[in-house]
């Protein structure tokens, strides 16, 4: 991914890193085959700019502490991400709706990148004056 996201870049956050726990090994293998096929199709279409699974464990940092984390329920924990290129938020949502993980209890959050990270704050200040 380029250092600066473009207006056509969208982040897909895949949540629920315990989706496989109730599945048999063959069901997990089948699910991974479907996920791989979906990912490869997005690559062929030139939609994927970046993607990676995340480790289950990490650290949570506040202004004064560093603790083991995340502490969110496993169904809320971020399992991985995709950065996709799409013409619109609606197209990015359609890409997300095809994620095979949805059938397994995962959720996908779709977010546009803020091209100007302070855009909302500037608008609020301008509106106040």
What is the predicted function of each stretch?
Residues 1-129:
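Conserved, structured core segments of small domains
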């Amino acid at each position: 991914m380029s250092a600066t996201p473009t207006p056509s870049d969208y982040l897909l956050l895949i949540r629920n890193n315990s989706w496989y726990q109730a599945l048999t090994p063959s069901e997990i293998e089948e699910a991974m085959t479907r996920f791989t096929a979906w990912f490869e199709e997005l690559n062929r279409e030139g939609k994927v700019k970046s993607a990676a699974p995340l480790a289950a464990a990490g650290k949570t940092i506040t202004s004064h502490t560093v603790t083991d984390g995340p502490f969110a329920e496993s169904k809320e924990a971020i399992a991985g991400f995709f950065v996709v290129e799409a013409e619109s938020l609606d197209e990015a949502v359609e890409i997300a709706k095809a994620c095979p993980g949805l059938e397994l209890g995962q959720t996908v959050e779709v977010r546009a990148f803020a091209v100007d990270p302070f855009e909302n704050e500037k608008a609020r200040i301008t509106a106040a004056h």
